[in-house]
Amino acid sequence: MTKHIPIEVFTSVWWIGLLSSIFTIIVILVALKGKSNQVKSYSSYLFALLFSLMYVITNVITIKNNTWNLLQNLPFQICYISLIIGIIVLVNKKQWMFEWMVFIATIGGLYAIITPVLTIGNSAWFYFEFYFLHAGIVFIPLYLHNIHNMRCRFDSCWKTLLRVQISIVLLLIFNFSTGANYMFLIEKPIVNHIFLIGEWPFYVIIINLIVIGHVYLINKFIVSQ
């Protein structure tokens, strides 16, 4: 298993990752605003291709380094699940996938950028991949909302939460069966986080309740406006 390496908050690396993520998202959104439908369509395919290449290259590197294994490198973390959904929704514009990105990917991506932990390697590539991935899953719903005018449906937040609960149950079964720790459902990540309270299973329950609260707030104060 690859050692998990937290990036200390307020260090130069942390600031570079945070600010470059915010800057890149804003620049791309501003650049694409008001462009023709053809440009918007091409940009969706381009982003899907870039995210796909990033995922493939990262896995090739881990295989080459002999660090790839079933217990750590399957796309079963919430942000990798969101990445795959994000790649697909860029192409097919499926409504439920967009809603997943709004309610779940946004939360996961933002908190990952604020309290980053490298889980699959610590070379320069994995630093870049970490911020590319998590800024990407924050970017995708903003892009679809602002550039393609996609909107969430009424009560979509609760349907999205149901999908998350199903994912948690399935991954708990997988984790217990294999000894994996996908979505950190068995063991807490090694990062100082205000919401990581207590030991298993209490921190899982608390995080789940906090996610529900975040989704409710996003729905009430942003989506419903």
Locations of regions flagged by a protein language model:
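Hydrophobic cores of alpha-helical transmembrane segments in multi-pass inner/ER membrane proteins
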Residues: 17-28, 80-91, 133-147, 203-220
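A contiguous pocket-lining binding segment that forms or flanks enzyme active sites
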Residues: 114-162
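Membrane-interface helix-boundary motifs at transmembrane edges
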Residues: 32-44, 91-97, 147-158, 224-225
